[in-house]
């Protein structure tokens, strides 16, 4: 067990140097540890037996895909590139990202009391700036440029910084929240119920969204708000390359999935209008 701990520690250092996010490092380490503790070897056949075991345990293709990525990464770390290439992730059907309607966004915001300045700010940053939950939690006060009305999102997915302009309403929300703070934490948003004001945790964000979503009768997650940001921007005519930069996507193809969402939105609108049908129906 001690030997495995040492391997995992070195592997995590390798992932960190590769620029992987803390969440990716945590997930990869978890699956590699399970693999090694189960007697896994640096051979593709051994990995396939492990994947078959997880399949029997009920793992979906999407989950198995993550495990394959972790094992391929670990094999490369150990210098077994050829074995890594033999591992092929299962096909995962592409699904359109789920987003909220504008009315649903307004409804959820309406159930967050104006006195809950922190909670409203969390919601508005996820939707109004399209942030990932990890990026939101890592924001520092120094990342807000009040003069130019923008925030600097540092070390997001892929370890790339990006600049996100924010509207005046959101900037005022940040100022209003900071005026309620009497701590010296460097983080923009902190936990409320602790003596020491630690930075906001993803768990808290998920909890708050579930609470207010239940109150509004709408299912909402941090990623759904990010999807909604992108979809609504596209519907408003914003250029897809600008949306790509705002989201921090390295590949345009990742952003282009939102065009499918918008096409579906337009298709439904056309079906509802029934313009052609109205011409030919008696």
Swiss-Prot record:
One of its GO terms (molecular function) is DNA binding. It holds the Pfam family Phage_integrase. GO terms for cellular component: cytoplasm. It comes from the Archaea. It is found in: Cytoplasm. Site-specific tyrosine recombinase, which acts by catalyzing the cutting and rejoining of the recombining DNA molecules. This is Tyrosine recombinase XerA. It comes from Thermococcus onnurineus (strain NA1). The gene is xerA.
């Amino acid at each position: 067990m001690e030997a495995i701990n040492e391997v995992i520690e070195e592997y995590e250092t390798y992932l960190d140097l590769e620029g992987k996010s803390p969440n990716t490092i945590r997930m990869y380490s978890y699956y590699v540890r399970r693999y090694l503790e189960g007697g896994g070897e640096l051979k593709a056949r051994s990995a396939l037996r492990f994947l078959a075991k997880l399949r029997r345990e009920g793992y979906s293709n999407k989950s198995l895909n993550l495990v394959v990525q972790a094992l391929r990464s670990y094999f490369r770390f150990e210098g077994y590139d050829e074995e890594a290439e033999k591992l092929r992730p299962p096909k995962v059907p592409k699904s359109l990202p789920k987003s909220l309607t504008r009315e649903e966004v307004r409804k959820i915001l309406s159930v967050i009391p104006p006195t809950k300045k922190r909670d409203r700010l969390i919601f508005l940053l996820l939707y109004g700036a399209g942030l990932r939950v990890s990026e939101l939690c890592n924001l520092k006060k120094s990342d807000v440029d009040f003069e130019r009305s923008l925030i600097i999102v540092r070390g997001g997915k892929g370890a790339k910084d990006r600049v996100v302009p924010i509207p005046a309403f959101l900037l005022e929300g940040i100022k209003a929240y900071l005026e309620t703070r009497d701590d010296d934490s460097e983080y923009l948003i902190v936990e409320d119920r602790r003596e020491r004001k630690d930075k906001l945790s993803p768990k808290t964000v998920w909890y708050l969204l579930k609470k207010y979503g239940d109150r509004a009768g709408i299912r909402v997650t941090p990623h759904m708000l990010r999807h909604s940001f992108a979809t609504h921007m596209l519907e408003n005519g914003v250029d897809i390359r600008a949306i790509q930069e705002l989201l921090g996507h390295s590949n345009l193809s990742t952003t282009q999935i939102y065009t499918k969402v918008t096409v579906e939105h337009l298709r439904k609108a056309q079906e509802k209008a029934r313009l052609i049908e109205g011409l030919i129906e008696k």
